[in-house]
Amino acid sequence: MEVKNIGIPHVLPPASVCDDPLCPWHGHLKVRLKLLEVTVEKVRMHKAAVVIHEWLHYIRKYNRYERRRKRMRVRVPECIEVKPGDKVIIAETRPLSKTIAWVVIGKKEDVVEWKAKHETLQA
């Protein structure tokens, strides 16, 4: 099966192939350009997982940052294997169910840094 170009240049496609229609690489699911780096918390649902997105929010009154976190449910295609504790890249998509509107597009290890790729092209 042919791997689609999802329009995100830094993320490598998975090595395995699936026939999942809701896979951005091998199916017909389109992704939007909102990307997040998150940590997988639970993988108990069928083809879905719960992830945690953590970020720092600046409080101007106290000149300090506070840590914020959000739990999100994401779709996990069959070609991407994830387990709790993995760092993954997720992309926004159309609503797939009542609570799922994001899909895993790859693990953090599968991301190619743009500068490193650009330097190798010029060398």
From Swiss-Prot:
User: Which organism does this record belong to?
Assistant: Pyrobaculum aerophilum (strain ATCC 51768 / DSM 7523 / JCM 9630 / CIP 104966 / NBRC 100827 / IM2)
**Family, per entry:** Belongs to the universal ribosomal protein uS17 family.
Biological process per Gene Ontology, one example term = translation
What task does this protein carry out? One of the primary rRNA binding proteins, it binds specifically to the 5'-end of 16S ribosomal RNA.
Q: Tell me which GO cellular component terms the UniProt record holds.
A: cytosolic small ribosomal subunit
InterPro entries given in the database record: NA-bd_OB-fold (IPR012340), Ribosomal_uS17 (IPR000266), Ribosomal_uS17_arc/euk (IPR028333), Ribosomal_uS17_archaeal (IPR019978), Ribosomal_uS17_CS (IPR019979)
What are the protein's UniProt keywords? Ribonucleoprotein, Ribosomal protein, RNA-binding, rRNA-binding
Q: What is this protein called?
A: Small ribosomal subunit protein uS17
Q: How does it assemble?
A: Part of the 30S ribosomal subunit.
Q: Pfam families under this entry?
A: Ribosomal_S17
One GO MF term, please? rRNA binding
Recorded hits in SUPFAM superfamilies, A to Z, give: Nucleic acid-binding proteins
Which NCBIfam families does this entry report, sorted A to Z? PRK08572.1 (NF006345), uS17_arch (TIGR03630)
